[in-house]
Amino acid sequence: MSKVFITCALPYANGPTHLGHLRSTYIPADIYARYRRLRGDDVLFVCATDEHGTPIAVKAEAEGRTPLEVATRYHEMIRGDLERCDISFDSFTRTTDELHHEIAQKFFLKLYEKGFIYEKDIKQLYCGDCQRFLPDRYVEGTCPYCGSEGARGDHCEGCGRHLEPLQLEDPRCMVCGSEPEVRDSRHYFFRLNQFQDEIREWIEGSEMPSNVRNYAIQWLREGLKDWILTRDMEWGVQVPLEGNEGKIIYVWGEAFLGYISSAAAWSKKTGRDWREYWDSGAIHFIGKDIIYHHAIFWPALLMAYGCRTPANIIAGEYLSLEGQKMSTSKNWVVWTSDFLERFDRDLLRYYLTVNAPLTRDTDFSWDDFQRRVNDELADVLGNFLHRTFSFTGRFFDGRVPAAGELTAEDLEFLESIRAAHDTVAELLDKFQFRDALMHIIKLAKRGNKYFNDQEPWKAVKESPARASTCLHLCNLLAANLGKLLRPFMPSAAGRILSIMNLEDEAWGFHELREGQVIERAKPLFSKITDEAIEEEKAKLIEEDDEVETVTIDDFTTMDIRVGVIRSAERIEGSDKLLKLIIDVGEREMQVVAGLAEKYSPEDLVERKITVLVNLKPAKLFGVKSEGMVLATGESLNILDPGDAEVGERIR
């Protein structure tokens, strides 16, 4: 029996969960935790709500509440969402807990004492009326990229770009509306650059999935820069050094430790040592938007402290909605609680698992959800189980009949049942959740074919022994389907095992004794009606109708052309921005693009792109930008113009 430490990325407590959160992080992590428990491993599965940072503080001021009141409200919502989805945490705590503050401050102090944290002055926006510095979302203004008003100090909803407060044009304090000034502020930095070689060696020697490994190596190629570790605000974990009143540890300097504080809280309750689990190798489940933090920054902090680094990092890619990027601000999203008001949690766990491999972006479509539930769960899995149980009840008095002499076809069918647990286990060990679940569905499909080929409705009259053997093997498959589905669809699996009067045993092939009582059962899965799907789609359309439209004249003012990147380099002081020299046919232009998290400069040189060439020039980090490179989605995939000639206008 091995000890296993499994974590989920901490959900941020400024809103409830939506399907994107569940798909990328919580459902796959729970599948893996349940699987390892069934294998007999000693699992510690932890999480917490991340309750510090500017978004919560800003929301609290806007609502006339304290940040703790806002965080508490959403902590309870998030906890409820995850419990209703059968996420089986051993510990789910909060970063506002006293224990978390204590652990985070001790961690900070040790790094400071070891010389890995130093002080440096930086320039920040300061509101004279409020008499405070304005980090992140405490400031808004005009986006320098797309010109959208109301862009926040960390993000523009208009174009999706990451921003820094000093980049905003016409910045305003979010609280009082006054224009801030630029002042120097002293902050603490972590010597991330010092761990460049150690991080590279760790990543290259790890078993991380390619999407995590490649992303991290791309950053390492560019060289790591020291990381600011503090913020000027009151809400958060206070810097534990004298003379630093009003300074907190940056959320990415303490939120990681929510894994540790949640485990430590579990230790206090159980009397068991969480360190034994951590030292066995932690497995982090996260969304791909925080790969950098977990694959670069977090292991460097652990190396500096002297702790073991994670054993693996599993990053789920993005989920879009009906072909469009999800947006909570525009309500283009399916909230977990809304989904569960109408549909069963197992349908959610099933669809978000089989929709696509975890390492690939995918889309949630109501039509596809209906199709897969109806075709795969109702018509394949549910149909096989219902036929087997009903036939057993009708012709064998509700008891598993004896198996007679086995034919070659019977033996082949039996072997597929015997091998299933090993096949699914091998896939789950590789974190291939979709393939593992689809193997189970294919096994149920094979069961339907076997049932049809054997024609037990005829055999029960013409050859009772043949019908008895067929139903014995079909019940054997049903029992093992129930066992196999436990990590993926625990509620449905429990119903199958209950119908068959079976115990929740360890992972592995399950023999079935003759005479086992099979209870009368209704179909496990009902088909989803067209009306139900149309109602859900209508909710999105109602919201979409509010989107502001533009005329063809508006569109024709935009000069979008095919270009080719002649040179690319990083911009000093920014982790997101690249300076590009782009050939657009008649001339070369300089563009600052927020592509550094996705692409290295070397990857972009001589690459054809589409670029908006008549954008009003702006300065970003002191570098002039004359246009905008077009890319899609949160993943910032550059639009490929194909065979179009450089300089051609896109119409």
UniProtKB/Swiss-Prot annotation:
Q: What organism does the record attribute this protein to?
A: Methanothermobacter thermautotrophicus (strain ATCC 29096 / DSM 1053 / JCM 10044 / NBRC 100330 / Delta H) (Methanobacterium thermoautotrophicum)
PANTHER family the record matches: METHIONINE--TRNA LIGASE, METHIONINE--TRNA LIGASE, CYTOPLASMIC
**For the motif 'HIGH' region, what are the positions?**
11-21
Q: Which GO terms describe its cellular component?
A: aminoacyl-tRNA synthetase multienzyme complex; cytosol
Keyword Cytoplasm on entry:
yes
Name-wise, this protein is: Methionine--tRNA ligase
Positions with a binding annotation for Zn(2+): 143, 146, 156, 159
Q: Name one GO biological process term.
A: methionyl-tRNA aminoacylation
Its subunit composition reads:
Homodimer.
What the record notes about the co-factor is: Binds 1 zinc ion per subunit.
